[in-house]
UniProtKB/Swiss-Prot annotation:
Protein name: Cytochrome c biogenesis protein CcsB
UniProt record similarity statement: Belongs to the Ccs1/CcsB family.
Main location: membrane
Quaternary assembly: May interact with CcsA.
The encoding gene: ccsB
Annotated S-S bridges: none
GO CC annotations, alphabetized: plasma membrane-derived thylakoid membrane
Source organism superkingdom: Bacteria
Length: 451
C-alpha cells in the first residue's frame, strides 16, 4: 500500500477544518480590526496632506530628493508607493476589503450569536441560581401574575414557564452593534465602488465657450459609463466680486448643461461651495484665470488675443499678451493684467512701462490708435463623479443610528416562586445605577404584598 492509498484518519480530515477555524478566529480578532482601521486612517490622512493627481514635475518641485521631507519623503517615494493617488491604489483597496472581511467575520461569529443568546428565554429553576446575581432578593409573596403585570408596566417583555418568569428589555442594544458593523460595511463598499467607478477631471474654460469632459485626471477602471458623452457645458458668463480693498470676495460661473444639439437641459450659477450637479456629475468652482483680451488697432476689426499666465516666481499671478501694431508684426506692445477689475499695464518694444489703460480707453502708441475693449475671464472647474457617495452617506446615517442603539441598556430580570417565597434578581450590561434604582423600585412595589 502506498502512502497515497493509506486511509485518511479523522484527525487528518479535521486538520483543514481546524485551520479554517483558526483563520476565522484571527480575522475576527478585534486587535486586527483596530490595526487595519488605524492603517486606513493613516493613509487617508496622507492622501489629504499630499496633493493628489498632480503632474510629475509638481512632485519633483515640491518633494525634492535633497532635502527630503521628514528625511525620506521624496517625489520618487510618492510615485513608487502611489501616494499621489492613494485612494485608488491596490494596497489601499486591499486594506478596505480586509477590514470589511474582518467586520463581516466578527458580525457572524460574535454579534449574531450574542443577539441569539439575548433573545433566548432563560428561566431560573433553582433558588441558588440567584446567588450569582449582584442584585437579588427574596420576598414573601405568591402572586406571580401581579409581578408579571408590574414588569410589563415597566416596559419589560415577560415570559412565564410554570413558577418562573424571565423578563427583558433593551434588546435593541444588542442589535445596535450589528447595525454599526453593517453601516461600516456599506461605507467601505461605497468607498471601493467610488474608487472603481468614479473619475476626477479639470477644465479652464473661457467665457462663452462650450466644452465636454475630457481632461481626466483620475479615473477608476469602471468609470467609462460615468463620463458624459451626450451632453456638455456652456460657460455663459464668468465674473468676480471684489471687496472695497481690491481683494477677491467671490467668483461666479453662469453655466448651462446642453445636449449635442445645443439645447439647454439645466441652468445654474455656481460659486465656491455651491456646485452644479447633473446626472451624477458635479461641477465645482475652484479657480479662475484671464483667457484673453479684445482689442482694435486703428479701424481694424475687433480681434481677440489669448493671454498666458506668466512665471513670477511665486510673487502673485500675472497674465500677459503681445499686441502687434504693424501688419508685418515687426512692432508691438506687451499688455499685462493681474485681475479682471480692468486695469492693464502697457509696455513698449523696449520693455518700458508706457501707460495704464482700462477697457474702452484709446492709446496712441507706435503711430497707431490702440483700443482695449475687454478682458475675457476663464473659469476653473473641478469635475467629479463618485457613484459611491450615496452608499457612504447611507452608511454614515446607519452608523449614527447604530451607535445610538448600542447605548440602550439590555436589562434582564428573573423571578422564581417556591412555596411562599419569591426570588427576584436581575442584571444589565450598562447604566448600572439606573437599573439598580429601577429594580429597587420594583421590589418596593412588591413588598406590600407580603401581608
Amino acid at each position: 500500500m502506498t502512502i497515497s492509498d493509506s486511509p485518511q484518519t479523522p484527525e487528518n480530515l479535521s486538520l483543514p477544518k481546524q485551520g479554517f477555524r483558526q483563520l476565522i478566529k484571527i480575522v475576527a480578532d478585534l486587535r486586527l480590526a483596530i490595526v487595519l482601521l488605524l492603517a486606513i486612517a493613516l493613509f487617508s490622512i496622507s492622501g489629504t496632506v499630499i496633493e493628489q493627481g498632480e503632474t510629475i514635475s509638481f512632485y519633483q518641485q515640491n518633494y525634492p530628493e535633497d532635502p527630503a521631507l521628514f528625511g525620506f519623503l521624496t517625489w520618487k517615494v510618492i510615485l513608487i508607493l502611489g501616494l499621489n493617488h492613494v485612494y485608488t491604489t491596490w494596497w489601499f483597496l486591499s486594506l478596505l476589503v480586509l477590514f470589511g472581511t474582518s467586520l463581516t467575520t466578527c458580525t457572524f461569529t460574535r454579534q449574531f450569536p450574542a443577539l441569539k443568546a439575548a433573545r433566548k428565554w432563560n428561566f431560573y429553576q433553582k433558588a441558588r441560581q440567584f446567588e450569582k446575581l449582584a442584585l437579588s432578593t427574596e420576598l414573601a409573596i405568591n402572586d406571580l401574575k401581579f409581578v408579571n403585570n408590574l414588569l410589563e408596566q415597566k416596559g419589560y417583555k415577560t415570559f412565564q414557564e410554570n413558577q418562573a418568569i424571565y423578563a427583558r428589555k433593551g434588546i435593541i442594544g444588542k442589535i445596535g452593534p450589528i447595525v454599526v458593523h453593517a453601516a461600516m460595511l456599506i461605507i467601505l463598499g461605497g468607498a471601493i465602488w467610488g474608487a472603481l467607478t468614479g473619475f476626477l477631471a479639470q477644465a479652464m474654460v473661457p467665457t462663452g465657450s462650450e466644452f465636454k469632459v475630457n481632461n481626466i485626471i483620475e479615473a477608476g477602471p469602471l468609470s467609462q459609463p460615468q463620463i458624459p458623452k451626450d451632453w456638455g457645458i456652456r460657460v455663459n458668463r464668468f465674473w468676480i466680486d471684489y471687496t472695497p480693498d481690491g481683494t477677491i470676495d467671490q467668483f461666479y460661473s453662469d453655466l448651462s448643461v446642453i445636449n449635442n444639439d445645443g439645447e439647454e437641459l439645466k441652468h445654474k450659477t455656481i460659486y465656491v461651495n455651491e456646485p452644479l450637479r447633473y446626472h451624477g456629475v458635479t461641477f465645482y468652482q475652484t479657480d479662475w484665470g484671464i483667457a484673453g483680451v479684445q482689442a482694435q488697432v486703428n479701424n481694424s476689426p475687433i480681434f481677440q488675443l489669448p493671454m498666458a499666465l506668466l512665471n513670477t516666481n511665486g510673487n502673485g499671478r500675472i497674465w500677459g499678451t503681445w499686441i502687434p501694431t504693424k501688419p508685418d508684426l515687426s512692432e508691438g506692445v506687451s499688455l499685462l493684467a493681474k485681475d479682471l477689475q480692468g486695469t492693464m499695464m502697457v509696455y513698449d518694444q523696449k520693455g518700458d512701462l508706457y501707460s495704464a489703460v482700462r477697457p474702452g480707453m484709446i492709446l496712441d502708441i507706435n503711430g497707431v490708435r490702440l483700443k482695449i475693449y475687454q478682458l475675457i475671464g476663464s473659469t476653473g472647474l473641478q469635475i467629479k463623479a463618485d457613484p459611491g457617495i450615496p452608499f457612504v452617506y447611507t452608511g454614515f446615517g446607519l452608523l449614527m443610528m447604530g451607535v445610538i442603539m448600542s447605548y440602550v441598556s439590555h436589562s434582564q430580570i428573573w423571578v422564581l416562586q417556591e412555596d411562599e417565597h419569591c426570588y427576584i434578581g436581575g442584571k444589565t450590561n450598562r447604566s448600572q445605577v439606573t437599573f439598580e434604582r429601577e429594580l429597587l423600585g420594583i421590589i418596593e412595589s412588591l413588598e406590600p404584598e407580603k401581608t
